[in-house]
């Protein structure tokens, strides 16, 4: 009994020290990310901004440990962690509708950010914009209106990442639902027998259906 007690007295402080080191490491890393985001001047050029239209899908690699984890474990063709839909706001200015967990933002779920804010919160040279091949002015408007409809409903973020649950959305699910309900095309279904994971960005970058309008990433596109 005394031997077990001694071992416990030795092991518990070691475990506590390890946990403290890990916590400190992640805290310091997160603070560095916040500093980098605050000081970032990253934006699209004026020429790139003029290329955008409602209904475009915009991707980024955000700042933070969670964003890095998504990039690392998702193993996409591009190092991206988040996406949203480009719209015009009530002032006629470019903005992005997207959904974010309240662990990462002050608002949980659906939100609208000015384009420059969305870009500023992106790691440098991580932004990609894709456009659906069939995106004409009518479809563009309908996609934007449907995205705004979900924004008005204040749909919460889906922390369970369950694409069968239509009461909550994660970022790729939101984009998929908007396009699926407006264009009546299931973007996750590439062919009659091929379907991509609902958490994947690949469906919104596949050359059979999308053109990449802006690409600040250095990785090779999907073949």
Identify the role of each PLM range.
Residues 69, 125-190:
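Active-site nucleophile-His-acid catalytic modules used for acyl/amide transfer and hydrolysis
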């Amino acid at each position: 009994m005394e031997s077990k007690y001694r071992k416990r007295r030795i092991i518990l402080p070691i475990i506590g020290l390890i946990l403290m080191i890990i916590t400190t490491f992640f805290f310091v890393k997160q603070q560095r990310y916040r500093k980098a985001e605050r000081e970032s001047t990253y934006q699209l050029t004026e020429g790139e901004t003029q290329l955008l239209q409602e209904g475009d899908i915009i991707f980024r690699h955000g700042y933070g440990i969670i964003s890095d984890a998504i990039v690392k474990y998702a193993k996409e063709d591009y190092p991206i962690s988040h996406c949203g839909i480009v719209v015009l706001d009530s002032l006629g200015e470019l903005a992005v509708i997207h959904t974010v967990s309240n662990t990462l933002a002050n608002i949980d779920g659906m939100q609208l950010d000015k384009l420059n804010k969305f870009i500023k919160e992106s790691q440098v040279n991580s932004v990609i914009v894709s456009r659906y091949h069939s995106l004409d002015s009518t479809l563009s408007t309908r996609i934007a209106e449907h995205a705004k409809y979900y924004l008005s409903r204040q749909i919460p973020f889906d922390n369970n990442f369950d694409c069968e649950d239509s009461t909550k959305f994660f970022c790729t699910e939101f984009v998929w639902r908007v396009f699926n309900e407006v264009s009546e095309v299931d973007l996750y279904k590439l062919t009659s027998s091929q379907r991509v994971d609902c958490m994947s960005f690949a469906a919104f970058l596949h050359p059979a259906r999308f053109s990449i309008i802006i690409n600040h990433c250095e990785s090779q596109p999907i073949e």
